[in-house]
Amino acid sequence: IARGLAVKNPQTLLHTDAVQGFLKVPCSAKTLGADFLTISAHKIGGPKGIGALYIGPRVRNPKPLLAGGGQESGLRAGTEATAQIAGFARAVELRQENLEEKLLCMAKIRDYAAERLSAIPDLKILSAPGGAPHILSASLVGWPSQNIVNDLGSQGVCISAGSACHQG
């Protein structure tokens, strides 16, 4: 997307929501072609309600949404959540310890689950082989997703249906 956008309209700035992939898949604002990139602590075991915004060098004079003090280089009014910021930093440190080993373990669990689930009639694995190590997407034709979540939950298996940004 970034390459196509750069060719079609080089002045357009690109925002990338990297929350789900942060410290789980190799990526950077540069490799993604992102002018803005957001990440969040809660997806790596850090506190909820704290995130970070990368603003790239092509962004000239960003304007704050809320006017106020000089926090965050004048881009965000309000008291800085120092405890959450420290918690986010610690979560990053902990996540980076043995990161390759953790990612390999996640991928093995994902692959094992995909192998076991593929034996279920009418179940389709939607995730690409070798994809994100922490995501396994599957669909069971004709079954309401909430019923599957509830049935598996009653057996101690935790899954989710849809996504936080899903509407409807």
Where on the chain are the PLM-derived regions?
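Pyridoxal 5′-phosphate
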Residues: I1-G168
